[in-house]
Each structure stands twice: as structure tokens, then as C-alpha cells.
């Protein structure tokens, strides 16, 4: 499977849970910015992997992977011995 764009909205405001339990990455490795996109208030990024955060539960946490972000995340999935299929099943 090959993806060039992935965007998933999680109905939670707990960014740490999404990064560490769903993506299985470490939040301290991400850079935090006090501004966001798409009317989100802040975001975290690791390379081209973006996690946008809103205090509003309706918006929740948004994961956005564009082309290079998908390739980077594939590298992490490979290191975790997971596939895209397994990742989407965990989501």
C-alpha cells in the first residue's frame, strides 16, 4: 500500500495519547508551535508529520501527512514492524 496524503481527525483533545499510543512516537521529539492551520490553535511537528490541536472537542486532534510526511511515517512504521493496514486498524 502506498499513500501520498493522510488526514485523520481524532475526537479528543489529548495530543499525548494520539502521538504516543496511536502513532507510537514520543511527544518530546516533536517541535511545538503556538499557532495552527485550518483554525486549529497550535501544532506539533516531527519533520513532515503534523499534529494539529484544538481545545474544542468538536475539532479535536488532526493528523496530517502529506507526501514526504507519509514517507517519513512509513519509516517509523517499518521500525515498529507495522504496516499501513495495521496502523489504520489501530486508529
Q: Language-model segments: which ranges?
A:
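Structured, helix-rich domain cores that form ligand/interaction pockets
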Residues: 1-91
Amino acid at each position: 500500500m502506498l499513500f501520498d496524503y493522510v488526514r485523520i481527525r481524532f475526537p479528543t483533545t489529548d495530543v499525548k495519547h494520539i502521538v504516543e499510543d496511536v502513532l507510537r512516537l514520543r511527544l518530546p521529539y516533536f517541535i511545538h508551535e503556538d499557532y495552527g492551520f485550518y483554525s486549529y490553535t497550535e501544532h506539533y511537528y516531527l519533520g513532515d508529520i503534523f499534529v494539529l490541536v484544538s481545545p474544542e472537542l468538536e475539532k479535536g486532534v488532526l493528523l496530517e501527512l502529506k507526501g514526504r510526511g507519509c514517507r517519513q511515517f512509513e519509516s517509523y512504521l517499518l521500525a515498529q514492524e507495522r504496516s499501513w493496514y495495521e496502523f489504520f486498524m489501530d486508529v
